[in-house]
Amino acid sequence: MENNPSSKIEVAISSRFLDHQSNRNEGRYVFAYTIRIYNAGNVPARLIARHWQITDANGKVEYVTGEGVIGEQPRLRPGEEFRYTSGVVLGTEQGQMQGHYDMMADDGTEFTATIAPFVLSVPRTLH
């Protein structure tokens, strides 16, 4: 896969703890995350697949891959953005996620959009 300036995707993330869906006594901590994918390049591109690495506070790692996001493979023209919200369940009060999207420009060039690590944490538990 290539990475070049004409194919540039920016990814911004916010996450929150969902107390009403969690069960602390059972070690079930539910988090929602909202992702903004922005095409900062100068060519249209489609999100083809996602690759996640999810790590809990005990160091347990789970890998998740799949086509598109939330059942879609959005195509973004330059200057366009796509937002979606999804969720993850951890067995600990803290963790992190990171990964990348496989993208394809309209000319068939494949490239990667990096998803930088972000924290999942129950409020008032981050050390």
UniProtKB/Swiss-Prot annotation:
UniProt cross-references to NCBIfam families, sorted A to Z: PRK05461.1
Native organism: Xylella fastidiosa (strain 9a5c)
GO BP field: error-free translesion synthesis
Classification via Pfam families: DUF525 (PF04379)
InterPro entries for the chain: ApaG_domain, ApaG_sf, Uncharacterised_ApaG
Name recorded for this polypeptide: Protein ApaG
Domain ApaG: 3-127
